Each structure stands twice: as C-alpha cells, then as structure tokens.
C-alpha cells in the first residue's frame, strides 16, 4: 500500500527545486550525531515558503543529535475524514524524493496499546500536516546514509485524555519493541485575521505580528514547561486557534516518560514575514525536547 502525495507542487515543490530548497534550509547543517538526547520535536506545516525554514531547525537539531530508527509523526486532521485517531497501518508514503517505509510493527503496537486509536489509512489520504514533514526526513536520512521509518498518526480529537493515552501508548510500544523513537508534533500556532474568522484583538498593522507572537508565547511557555494542562488551559482561555495541540501534548507526555529534562525554542516566526498581509497571520515555532 502506497500513500501518494496530496500537496506536492503546492505546499512544497514537486520537482527538482525541492532539493534546492532543502539545501538552502540546511546550509548550516552540522555532522550527523549519535547522542540521541532528543525525544520529540515541534514543527509547523504550512507551505515551505512560509514555514519551511522554521521546520528545518527542528530537523537540523535532530540530525545533529542523531536520527532515530522511527519517527512517530502526529498531525491534526484538517479534512475531517476517517477515524478520529488514525494510525497509518503499513506500506509506504511517496514524495518527490521517493518512498519512505511505515514501521508497521510499531504502528500496530501503538494501536493495540492505545484505548482510542484505530488503524486507518483513509484519514491520511488528503491530509498535509504529516506529508510536508517527510522530505525533511528523507533528505537527512540520505545525508546520514541510514534508513528511517515513520508512523503517521492524525488527530481529529485533541484533548488531555487523548494526549495522555497516546503519549503512554507510544512510550510503551517503543519499550516493548526496543525501538529508538522521536515524536514529531506537527502544528501551526495562532491563525489570526478575517480570513480565519478569528480577530481576538485589534492593533495597528505594524503591531499585529508582535501581538500574535505575544499570544503564541503564552502557549509556548507552557510547552517549554512540559505543562500539558496549562497549555490546554491557555488555549481555552484565549480561544486560541493553534491547530495541533494534541500532537504537542502527546510529545510532552511521551518526553516526560522518556526522561526528557528540558525543552528549547529554536525558532519562531509568522507568515507576515513573507506575505506582509494582515488579513491572515499564522505563527510557526520550532521546539525540541531533550533528556
């Protein structure tokens, strides 16, 4: 079973210019490491022109720390189709850089240990939040001359109960299979503006990106503190439009269980830096969790 790309040529290049773009993102790439202290990372999932550099900061840190055997990649289900908690069961995913194999044993073990997840490929058919991460992983695996597999999981329900269940299931599955795992939580932060039907504050055009950043950093601080309850609390308090808190919460729960002691914000930006539009501003962050 092959999952074909849904957004190649739109969110990211579908031709040879993809490699050129990745080379620019990673021109400061260091040596492939072996420490393996990173347990999880947070990345955005907008078009590469807006958030690709920010995403590359997370993957650069993981590469220099040492690539794992398996990336468990969690993203929000924007389409609404398929199972609410959908683990892609087996096969491979295709991108312009080739195929990347699904770790089917890990996928099935997570679904078995979870009380809420299903094995389901339909939820992934048109979803972009996981697909856009794969070229980064493929490019770096080629650099490291190593094989890396993935477990894609889409989340249509995102709350404290879900993240506690999934974080624990992923941790227990990794232990049961003796698998070296890094979680990738795919999320964009605030979606501000009339285009998103979300205008919680008014400000002069030149002040808006700073206000968006202020609101995002209230959430980001909770993430850096490993505070799942606090993160969801801030989101509810602000009616915040972060789209992937479930993946981030799962990454925090897993990282705590895996012995992570610190989290670091590597990069933050907004779409305004590229678009210069105040009709729609989206926040993007790169974060890693380390032992």
UniProtKB/Swiss-Prot annotation:
Pfam families: Memo. InterPro entries: MEMO1_fam. It comes from the Archaea. Belongs to the MEMO1 family. This is MEMO1 family protein TON_0132.
């Amino acid at each position: 079973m092959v999952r074909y790309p849904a957004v190649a040529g739109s969110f990211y290049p579908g031709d040879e210019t993809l490699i050129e773009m990745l080379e620019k993102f990673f021109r400061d790439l260091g040596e492939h490491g072996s420490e393996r202290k990173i347990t999880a990372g947070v990345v955005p999932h907008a078009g590469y022109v807006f958030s690709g550099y920010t995403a590359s900061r997370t993957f650069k840190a993981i590469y220099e720390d040492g690539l794992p055997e398996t990336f468990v990649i969690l993203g929000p289900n924007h389409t609404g189709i398929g199972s609410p908690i959908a683990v892609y069961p087996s096969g491979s995913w295709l991108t312009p850089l080739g195929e990347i194999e699904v770790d089917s044993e890990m996928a099935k073990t997570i679904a078995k240990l979870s009380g809420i997840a299903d094995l389901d490929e339909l939820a992934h058919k048109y979803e972009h939040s996981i697909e856009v991460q794969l070229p980064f992983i493929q490019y770096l695996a080629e650099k490291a001359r190593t094989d890396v597999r993935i477990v894609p999981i889409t989340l249509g329900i995102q709350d404290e109960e879900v993240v506690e269940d999934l974080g624990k299931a992923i941790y227990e599955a990794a232990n049961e299979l003796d698998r070296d795992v890094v979680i990738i939580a795919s999320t964009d932060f605030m979606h501000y503006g009339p285009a998103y039907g979300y205008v919680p504050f008014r400000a002069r055009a030149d002040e808006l990106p700073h206000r968006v950043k202020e609101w995002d950093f209230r959430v980001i601080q909770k993430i850096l503190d490993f505070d799942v309850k606090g993160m969801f609390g801030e989101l509810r308090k602000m009616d915040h439009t972060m789209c992937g808190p479930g993946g981030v919460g799962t990454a925090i729960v897993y990282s705590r269980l895996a012995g992570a002691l610190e989290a670091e914000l590597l990069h933050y930006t907004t779409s305004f830096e590229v678009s210069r539009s105040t009709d729609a501003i989206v926040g993007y962050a790169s974060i890693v969790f380390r032992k």
